[in-house]
Amino acid sequence: MLSPSQEEAVCHGSGPCLTLAGPGSGKTYVLTRRIQHLITKGGVPPEQILVITFTKAAALEMKERFIGLMGQEYPVVFGTFHSVFYGMLRREPGFRTYRLLDHKSKQAILKETAYVVKMSCAEDDLMHMEQEISYIKNTMVALAEYASPYFPNEKIIKLYEHYEARKEVYHLLDYDDLLVKTRELLYKDPSFLSKWQKRFSYLLLDEVQDMNALQFEIIRLLALPDNNLFAVGDDDQSIYGFRGARPDLMFSFENYYPGVKILQLRDNYRCKARILQASLALISHNEIRFTKEILGQKEGKGNLEVVSLADKKAETAYLVQILKQQ
């Protein structure tokens, strides 16, 4: 049974909607019920519904829960950004000869590239190089404007350019390229853009607070012209800034989607009162966030303990000790 705030989200009609959903608010249930509503009440062909999550496991879980809800399988598309866009690219003649770069091969190309541009090939340095190349692509920052926290800027520029050139020689794509190339095609090829806009007339997006600028731009293009985008997220839960996540994009929804309906799932079914109150008191110190009313629905007060620890290693040891005592 849906709560009033859940029902409002599920029954949202056409047009853009941003639903604020904290932990324990029944977010996945709302998304699956929303898909059901679009098909059974809205008359939307299931093959025109695209549901994007951030992990393969989350996509599989949502699909299984949807099938359980409907009692049978429907051709709704569930996937991650990378899996969905890889599927789109593979259908294009210009990309049929390209292969996806696995981690081992990527490390080999990075090592070769680092040697050519006279950079360290140490394991930690290679890891930072990989992270920085990914960050540049996902934030869409101009190479000339990127400031590396680990290497001289001119070295990173040479590394990036040589890495891209080597991949092109072997017709290889890394995971970030799946998004970069999709965006390029959406902008450069009107027929490609139109085809996928018609293919997916309704978009549902999970964990919107973890989106980066590149992902946001692709979704913005795909959702046009009707903007039937149902986005669910919680700005209080964003932890992937180091990967280029842009939770601030949630605050810009009204600029990109005029007339967007902003809803909130108010009920928390996971936490007891004391834990919920303490969490809200702490997070309320964030200067930039959506103001939320969260109502605890779980009986009992709950136990709360404040512990100060020296570092992450001490924190991990403490948690292991607590778990062993349970």
What does each model-identified segment do?
Residues 1-11, 15-19, 50, 58, ...:
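Conserved helicase NTPase motor core
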Residues 19, 23-31, 258-261, 267-326:
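Helicase P-loop NTPase motor core
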Residues 66, 112-116, 278-286:
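Conserved AAA+ ATPase "sensor/coupling" helix adjacent to the nucleotide-binding pocket
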Residues 58-62, 85-89, 238-241, 271-277, ...:
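Switch/connector loops and helix/strand junctions flanking conserved nucleotide-binding motifs
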Residues 13, 73-75, 93-177, 200, ...:
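ATP-hydrolysis module of ASCE/P-loop NTPase motor domains
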Residues 15, 44-48, 74, 225-228, ...:
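Short glycine-/polar-rich loops that comprise or flank the Walker A/P-loop
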Residues 1-96, 194, 248, 277-280:
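P-loop NTPase Walker
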Residues 44-56, 76, 206, 232, ...:
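Conserved RecA-like ASCE P-loop NTPase motor core of nucleic-acid helicases/translocases
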